[in-house]
Structure formats: C-alpha cells, structure tokens
Amino acid sequence: MFTTKEGLANQLKTEGWKDFTLEYVPKGVMTDTYILKSNQTTYAVRCYPIFRSWLTKIEYGYLQAFVRNGIKVPVPFVYSNKKDGVSYIIYYWVEGETLKDKNDKLSEEQINSICDEVVENYRKISEFKTTKYGRVAEEGLFNYDSWKRFLQSEIEQSRLFFKHEKDEENVEICDGLYEYVEQIEEPSHCLVWSDFSLDNIIISDDNKLAAFIDFEGLMSGDPILGVSYLLSQEGNSRITRCILQKYGLYDNPEQRKLLDFYSVFRYIRLATYSKLPTPNNSPRDIIDNFLHYASTVKCDFKKHIDCVERMKRWFRIMKKKLTILIITALLSLMAIVGACC
C-alpha cells in the first residue's frame, strides 16, 4: 500500500465528505482501492501512486465518455489529482463478482450469453477513434504515427533489458517478434482496452455483464491486442475460447499467430518489471505463472539475428530521424551563409 486509510480519510474530510466509512480492498498491484460508504451510497475509491497521478483525469474522462455511449463501466463520481494529496477516482460501486470468481458456477449457456455481452462491450470501446498509436500518455495523447513503430520500439526496450540480464533466449524471442511486426497490417486508429482480464469483468447476481473495470492501460491500435491479453493469461479458460470463437479468431491460423504474437509481446513488456516492487507493494506473481499461455508459445518466435542485421534494423529506425537532422543542419548552414553574405 502506498496510501493509508487514515490519510485518505483525512483528505476526504477536508474535501467535504462527512459520516463515511472506508474499507481497504486487497486486490490489484498498480493502485490502492477502498470501499467508501456515505449516506447509504457505496463508492469505490481508486488511488494512484504519485508518478501516475496524471492518469486520474484521463481515466475519469474516458469513463464519462463510455457511460454516455452505453458502455458498461463504473459510473464516475469525482476525481482528484492534487500534488499535495492522494490522487484518486471515486465511482459508484459495481455490485457482483469477477468473471474469474464466477466462472466455475456458470453453465455453458450462461457463459455463451455473457461472452456475447463482453464482446459487444469491448467492440463499443474499439469504436472510439484516436489520432495516433501507442500507450496513453500524459494529457491523454498517443505518441506514435505508426502501430508497427510502437510495437518495435517496445520490443527494443525489452530486448535491452534481456541483454543486460544476459537472458539470450528472450533476446532471441525479441528478435523474432521484431521481425514478425513487418507482417502486421497497420490497423485503424481506435481505442484498445489492454486490461482485458477475467478479474476486470464484473458479473451481476443474475449472470449479466455489469461492467468492465480498470482502464489505466488504455492503448490506441489493434483491438486484437486486447483480446490476446486475455489469452496470454487465461489460455485454457472456456471463456477465452468462447470469446475467440465469437471474434472469429479461434480456427484462423493467421489470426492465431497474431494472437500469439501479442500474447508474447505482453510477456516481454511485463518481464522488464519483474525485479521491481509493485506500486502498492503487493507480491508480484512469477511471470511464467501469471502469463502461462504466453510462456508456452514464446519460443515459437525465437530467431537469432547477427550484428549485420542489427545494424540494418538500427538504420531503418534512425533513417527518418537522420534525414530530418541532416535537412535541419543544411537549412541552418544555408541561413548562416546567407547572413554572412
């Protein structure tokens, strides 16, 4: 925990809350969550660490937009990102159980109906259009002009980590992933819920979809990436299988390869945090256990790349930047010469 119940309670009191109770919810690794009860109404308080406080405004804004467009998410109430206090979003509590906890209690017919609702809700999120690609950044922007360039940049960062750790197997997996990116078609600019997890889907007592929760990892790019994140974690789940079938991805070899790519992409990204403490100091799962499916298919992407090919890759990445630098330098030189003459 990076917050305290007493500290949050004191802040809420200064902000006008009265006659309330707080209860800590021991779930998640990126945020601290509390149940807030006041005037017979129940809320969730989702608290963010200081270095991610900028997310409160962004996630709050997206939640408002989702609610307006009929997407099943928690209804936001208020947010705060004060520099001298706890940054949080307060939204109305969503009653129900997570789909992960509910899974074993559901019949095949119930799962089929729930998956219809889940797919529809996910597709509605993907209908939100953006202007660029990548992870959500401060001010709600996405920073890449190319989806491929975003993927390759993330893979390069992971490769550097594995190289530093002298983990040659995962270095070669990164090399294979990098090469596979060239086969991916540029998707349209659309929002991607990249926290697609059975833990982040709430099901009501009457076995209906109540809400998706957790939107701090929003991306802009290929919606299949979000589905693959579910696969990477829950590869053997009957719910995952049902969702893939409804998306038409289950029996399509090319699409399955793309799903595997995105699953392993998630693996190599999260692996770079494996030796770091979690923001709320909760235990971090062993990545091969947490992303079990991804760990079983990652070696399908292994490829040894020699130094010459590495140099070619570097040049392709830097070509545009070098061209801009050269043109800028020439224009500056011409301006100086012109001034001297």
Where are these regions (language model features)?
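An alpha-helical support segment within catalytic cores of ATP-dependent transferases
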Residues: 2-18, 111, 116, 127-194, ...
